[in-house]
Amino acid sequence: MDRSTSNGFRCIKSFANDTSSAQLKGTISALFRDYRKEKPVDNKTFALYLNQYLYDKKPLESKIERTIDKDLWKIEKVTFDAGYNNERMQAWIYLPKDAKPPFQPIIFFTGSNDIYSKEFDPKRIGSLDFILKSGRAFIFPIYKGTNERHDELNSDLQEETVLYKDHVIMWGKEFSRTVDYLETRSDMQADKIGYLGWSWGGFMGGIIPAIEKRIKAIVLNVGGMEMNRTFPEVDQLNYLPRVTQPILMLNGKHDMFFPVETSQKPMYDLLGTPSNFKKKIVYDAGHLVPRTDFVKETLVWFDQYLGPVK
């Protein structure tokens, strides 16, 4: 125990009729899942789970709501049918000016900060501008529960609630509807779609590509498995073996959110991608890999599996 002069200690005085002390002496159960022992569901059961993400292929009724002209790229805010409850969603489309269409679209799944944000700032993609500089389009969907679509969702952590389950299903549909929209644009190579996930998006990279097979290459920046339990219908454990696309995992050795042995390694091992099409790099870092390496490895991966930009 650290008893330095700057540290104190806390005392408690209990009352005669106080029963809380017994609870304070009770055992605290640690939040932990041993993924070496847990097994994913069989294919027949998973096919039933996959049916949750079906939606009617109604007209997208897409509309460009706003255009922002920057020196090196153009930004479009588009809205279209979300695939459920007659709801509309939005996506920000970033188009490089120094490259010729059609563009390879890289669809981003953001980190948890966007759950707590009330409004998306289209100028904030600074650390991801290398995607545009490589000649690719960068697609930022606004998922249910984030930014302007903020609702009662208050965490990215999976949990055993209908609220969480419903959101995962909505995110899956929204991603697919975003792909549907990209397929309508002549300036997009919709057969060369990349998935880029960051933190929460790295975790969701173990789910979304199992649902949406039009994704052709995946890069996960600090992703892993969570210790929280959730309903099996949306448990990442059951989706990972069905992620079969080429996938690159970039992780930190000191990541406190996704520890190497209990989170990162089980995710990598459970992936259904053949061993020669998946790769994991661990850096001497925490929940953020060095930017230079992130940029280099991401572009090399997309060049290899989507093809170099011409």
Give the residues covered by each predicted segment.
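N-terminal cap/lid segment of alpha/beta-hydrolase-fold proteins
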Residues: 55-100
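Short beta-strand element of the alpha/beta-hydrolase
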Residues: 90-91, 101-113
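Cap/lid segment of the alpha/beta-hydrolase catalytic domain
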Residues: 109-181, 230
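Short beta-strand/loop motif that positions the catalytic acidic residue
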Residues: 243, 249-251, 255
